[in-house]
Amino acid sequence: MENKVINFKKIIDSRGSLVAIEENKNIPFSIKRVYYIFDTKGEEPRGFHAHKKLEQVLVCLNGSCRVILDDGNIIQEITLDSPAVGLYVGPAVWHEMHDFSSDCVMMVLASDYYDETDYIRQYDNFKKYIAKINLEKEG
């Protein structure tokens, strides 16, 4: 599945708004881990890694941040600023998060538990990993 913006159904009435998140429905995988990022320093970017197998959906519950995605061929830049919008980040995608607003709360839904061996933390290693995947697809 390619990286994509997911527009969650928002239910609005006089009491406020509600968004339901359901695994294997509006989230394209089984959710094994949920974490959130808050109290960020706007000038301090985060991320700067890729995962070999992990899938994620990023949701900005409050405030905003700018996300850069790089699949080795295309670089995308997306601003997340709504709790009714998620960003699917697939495996083998380098991702960076920049320009956090002071009130930003970013929730991340993940397809698996934390596993340090799944991380690619150096951009040069990421490019080599992508080249290897592309060779395997061709051969």
Swiss-Prot record:
Gene Ontology MF: a single term: isomerase activity
Xref: CDD domains: cupin_QdtA-like
Keywords of this entry: Isomerase
Protein name in UniProt: TDP-4-oxo-6-deoxy-alpha-D-glucose-3,4-oxoisomerase
Name of the encoding gene: fdtA
Active-site residue list: H49 (proton acceptor)
Function of the protein: Mediates the isomerization of dTDP-6-deoxy-D-xylohex-4-ulose into dTDP-6-deoxy-D-xylohex-3-ulose in the biosynthesis of dTDP-3-acetamido-3,6-dideoxy-alpha-D-galactose, a glycan chain of the S-layer.
Lineage: Bacteria, Bacillati, Bacillota, Bacilli, Bacillales
Catalytic reaction(s) noted: dTDP-4-dehydro-6-deoxy-alpha-D-glucose = dTDP-3-dehydro-6-deoxy-alpha-D-galactose
Transmembrane domains' residue ranges: none
Entry keyword annotation includes Nucleotide-binding: no
SUPFAM superfamilies xref list: RmlC-like cupins
EC number: 5.3.2.3
Keyword Translocase: no
Quaternary structure (record): Homodimer.
